[in-house]
Amino acid sequence: MPLIPWPASADDSSKGKDDEKDIATKAKELFALAGEIPPEYFSVAAFAAGSLSLAASYFVHKRYFRRIPNAEWVSPNHLARKRWIKGRVTSVGDNDNFRFYHTPGIGWRWPLKFRRVPTLTKELKDQTIHVRIAGVDAPENAHFGRPAQPYAQEALAYLRARILGKTVFCQLIRRDQYGRMVSHVRLAPRFLPATLFRGPNLAEDMLRKGWATTYEQHGAEYGEGGVERYKQIEQEAKDARRGIWAKGVRGETPAEYKRRYAQAADGGEPPSKARAEKEQKRGWLQRLFSWK
């Protein structure tokens, strides 16, 4: 049952007037105390407030808006904190690394687009970060006079289709011997806001599709699930005969390929020639069943 709005009594009215008088009296007392404060104190307080505001603005700009042009600008503090940075992939030249343009803060997308990612090669010079995807090893392309591994072109095509021209998030881990930033890479979520959520783990995607193997050499870095998760995903791709495992699991891995050429560099017969002669001596039936 609703309460009946009885009219205010005379006592309530007088009490409200007394409260107003008390407030007015206290306000006068505060103004009087403020008048006794020396003017220089106000100057110090204003200077302190301005300094605090300036420091806060600098921190926000440094943390959220200042761009990292290239790997040389990545500081030890970034690596110690394993900082996540956002950027647009501008080129994919190899099967397990790429270059991306750091895009911090706002202004890169509509409706608040007032900054742009360069597209010309001369504009991108020294303005991109070279990223090595952590935890995986992909088939080697032909370079330095070495032949490409089987499925190298297919692995490169997959990676380009997956990330080229797209936004990714990189967690900076360390700088490798080639000056690349070893990083955990996540794609932007498809439907959820990228500022609050991150998408799939790129390394796990590569393993799942069969276009990479788990990197197990010195300095290997893995995601939250550790090496066990990576090996499990790789095994699932092997069982399903995906990607580089389409013809079996006994092919030469990227790690074995690089080890073979490293040993050959120390002396001896070129590994490609020795391997070709060995293959010729084997019968076609033996080569066929060796992939199982």
From Swiss-Prot:
One Pfam family, short name: SNase
Annotated catalytic residues: R132, E140, R180
Keyword annotations from UniProtKB, A to Z: Calcium, Endonuclease, Hydrolase, Membrane, Metal-binding, Mitochondrion, Nuclease, Transmembrane, Transmembrane helix
Enzyme class: hydrolase
Entry annotated with the keyword Methyltransferase: no
PANTHER family attached to this UniProt entry: EBNA2 BINDING PROTEIN P100, SERINE_THREONINE-PROTEIN KINASE 31
Protein name per UniProt: Probable endonuclease LCL3
